Every structure is written in structure tokens, then in C-alpha cells.
Amino acid sequence: MATMHSTTYLLTASVLVLFFCGDGAVINCEADDEEPWSYHGKTNGPSAWGETYQDCYGSNQSPIAIKTAETVIDADTGKLQMKNYDVPITKATIVNNGHSAQITPKDDVARTIEVEGSVYTFQQLHFHWGSRYDQGSEHTLDGKRYALEAHFVHTNKENAIAVVGVFFQSSTHNSEGFEPIVEVLSDIPFKNDFTDLKSDLVLEELLPSNPSDYYHYDGSLTTPGCNEGVAWFILKGVMEMGEQQLAELRDLYSTTKDKDYAGCKLTDNYRPLQPLNDRVVIETSN
């Protein structure tokens, strides 16, 4: 029979466990330490990425804090023209790669972006999200983090990379454009799980109404190897998605099913902010 003291202790411990899990700030996943890199590992987290991937210590890294008071407004910067973003992706795979949920189209449609004569072809879409509604995005805008940041990754003929970033904020209303993704997340709970999308995905439905309004700077990949020379276009418009849709993402795990995965929720998968150094953030308003 438990004594009053032991009962009080158990209740206190339960409250503490609930507090830390609810806040999402503490992720205790031993399997993370077995990976080449992770977001929450004790020895291979973001602060240590540069030990293995030297470019992660570079001077032009991403993500950054975008401060609108310090951007340079350039009326001559070209519009971001998108082609075939309105054409449904009828065939695509989605994979839990242990770091994100990533979607790769498998149809023959070339979806492209063009800015100032440079054309980049869409390759994949992935996401960074948080354990709470006020964190998750990699970039910040005037100090604010959003619940999720979508990255539309493109390459050109020279294999240069351009990424379009879109902020999503938590809402009571679900995003219809996100539903083809959410409906299959339960099929990829663990790392290396993959499946095909069951419904058509329209990229345009994941974009704000005026994608030509954006912030642009030169940066890097936000994951190892942190390769620099990436052209970033962070769209100004903020999209909405349902809290329940975010909850489905938070139910993914960062490790495989054969590991001790209980503490390995795939969440808060965003890299800390990197110094801007001498770079300039260009702001457009078209």
C-alpha cells in the first residue's frame, strides 16, 4: 500500500513528466546518438554538425533571422514566376527519413520557378515543425517563429539549388491543400517508412496568393552537409493549417521501429538561427 509521501512523490513526478512532454523542449531519444547527425542528440546535435560536415561552420549558413527593418527593398528584383504549380501531382511518394516527411513527385510534369532568367525545377517538398504552435519554422520573421515551414526544393541544369520557404501558422481550420499529405502520415510512422500519396497534391494550394512577394538571400542547406550557394526565397504570405494536421506530423518518430522509439518523436526539427554576417536580405513587393 502506498504511503501519502510516496503517493505525493508519484503525483509530482507525473506532473513533471507531463510538463516536459507537453512543452516538447526535452526529447530523450538514445537512438538519435547513433545517427550521423540529429536535432536532439547529445553528441551529434546542431552545435556539433560542423565537426563532421565542415560546411556547417561556414559563413553563409541558413536559416537566418529576417528583420524587416534591415532588409533592402529592391524594386528591380524580378518576380518569382511559377509554372505548372497548379498542375496536380498525380503520382508521388512520401517518406519519413528520420528528419522530416519528404514528398517526391513521380510524374513527368516539370514544375519550375523562374527569377531573373534563372529556371529551377521542383524536386521535392519537406517540412520543419514544432511541438507547439509558436515554434517549428526554421527562419524567423521579426523574431517570430511559425508552427511549420515548408521547403520547396528546386535545382537548375548546373545543379544549383533554390528553395522556396513558406510559413504556416496553426489554425482551427484544416488546410485542404495539406490533406493529401496528412491522410497518409499514419502509413509512415517510423524512419525509412514510405508510401504513395493516395490523392492528388497541388503545390499551388500550399502557397500564399502572391508568391512574388518574398525575402531573398544567399544561404545554405539547413541540414548536413550544409552546402552553401543556395538561393532562398521566403514568401511573405503566411498560410494556415489545422492544429489537428500538425498533431499528425508530431506523431511521427525519428527512428526505426526496431529501436527504443518511445522518446523519439519527430518534432522541433529545425536548425538554430545562423549569423547573417555580411549578407543582405532583399525584399520584394510586386
Per-segment meaning from a language model:
Residues A2-N286:
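Alpha-carbonic anhydrase
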